[in-house]
């Protein structure tokens, strides 16, 4: 792996590009340390970042050399995740490993922990914790408090989509990578619709640390 990473680093230097390693899941600890030492970014997903007792990890303890995001293509977008769609979908597909009620209860506890964290950290108004759109924006606002080098917002979150683009553990059971982009009401969205909608502008403002997003020169 030394030679392969060396070649990747050299080509990235020549192209003035970043390399991001997908080091989620069952990856040995030395891999993350090695990526950091060689200047390659790892991957951090908010729902997977937890402290020693399983509590939401404080922003200050997130890795610096990583690309941080709220969700990933292997999970439903934030609005779907907050609604428990990731649990119900696996149940419908017959790939849920625990009773549905237990999984939903665990998801509710996870969500409650994060809501409490967002409110305590001042990125979510207590009065808005029942509004999934406001929670989604607050989750991204939390990312800005981490030291992570690169922050990522998903297009599906920007438009309010709820459906997962990919469901691990399936082949023909789910239309992986064939889900048309839609807003939170299920209406399909074209590229022009994305630029005209309000939610993408709100999320862009959050990611830029602004109260509102400036008018784009592309519109």
Segment roles from a protein language model:
Residues 1-219:
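Catalytic cores of glycan-processing enzymes that make or break glycosidic bonds
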């Amino acid at each position: 792996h030394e030679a392969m990473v060396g070649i990747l680093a050299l080509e990235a230097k020549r192209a003035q590009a970043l390399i991001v390693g997908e080091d989620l899941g069952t990856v040995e600890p030395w891999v993350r340390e090695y990526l950091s030492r060689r200047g390659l970014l790892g991957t951090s997903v908010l729902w997977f970042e937890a402290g020693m007792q399983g509590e939401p990890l404080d922003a200050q303890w997130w890795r610096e050399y990583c690309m941080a995001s709220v969700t990933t293509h292997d999970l439903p977008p934030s609005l779907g995740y907050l609604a428990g769609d990731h649990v119900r979908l696996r149940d419908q597909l017959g790939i849920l490993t625990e009773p549905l009620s237990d999984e939903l209860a665990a998801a509710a506890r996870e969500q409650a922990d994060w809501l409490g964290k967002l409110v305590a950290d001042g990125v979510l108004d207590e009065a808005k914790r029942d509004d999934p759109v406001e929670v989604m924006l607050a989750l991204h606002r939390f990312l800005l408090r981490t030291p992570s080098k690169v922050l990522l917002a998903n297009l599906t979150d920007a438009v309010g989509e709820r459906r997962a683009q990919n469901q691990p553990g399936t082949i023909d059971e789910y239309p992986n990578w064939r889900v048309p982009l839609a807003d939170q009401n299920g209406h399909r969205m074209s590229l022009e619709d994305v630029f005209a909608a309000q939610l993408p502008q709100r999320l862009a403002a959050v990611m830029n640390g602004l109260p509102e997003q400036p008018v784009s020169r592309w519109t």
